[in-house]
Amino acid sequence: MGTRCLLVLLLVLLVLRCDVQGDDMARQDEATGPTLLSQMQESLYSYWGSAKAAAQDLYEKTYLTAVDEKIRDMYSTSTAAVRIYTGILTDQILSMLSGDS
């Protein structure tokens, strides 16, 4: 009976040692190798960065200062016109609400 207990104890210790050793190896694998999620994240970031750089290059190649100035001028004149007509409309509404004839 003593040999059986010794054999069972030896097997239990062997299984525990293998389990602990397996956990250590799994931790080392996780620490050294990137996970699938991090690999996918890195590839998506690289694709995004390359697409962003390509769009920036295309914008810089097609950028025309004359067109930019025209757009700014059109914006300023249209906002000035809208501001004037909004003021006129506001005055009309206020005069209708106040009842002045």
Swiss-Prot record:
Maturation-removed propeptide residues: 23-28
Parts of the chain that traverse the membrane: none
Cleaved signal peptide residues: 1-22
Keywords: Chylomicron, Glycoprotein, HDL, LDL, Lipid degradation, Lipid metabolism, Lipid transport, Secreted, Sialic acid, Signal, Transport, VLDL
Cellular component per GO, a single term: low-density lipoprotein particle
Protein family: Belongs to the apolipoprotein C2 family.
Organism encoding this protein: Acinonyx jubatus (Cheetah)
Region (Lipoprotein lipase cofactor): 78-101
Name of the protein this chain belongs to: Apolipoprotein C-II
Posttranslational mods: Proapolipoprotein C-II is synthesized as a sialic acid containing glycoprotein which is subsequently desialylated prior to its proteolytic processing. Proapolipoprotein C-II, the major form found in plasma undergoes proteolytic cleavage of its N-terminal hexapeptide to generate the mature form apolipoprotein C-II, which occurs as the minor form in plasma.
Subcellular location: Secreted
GO terms, biological process: lipid catabolic process; lipid transport; positive regulation of phospholipid catabolic process
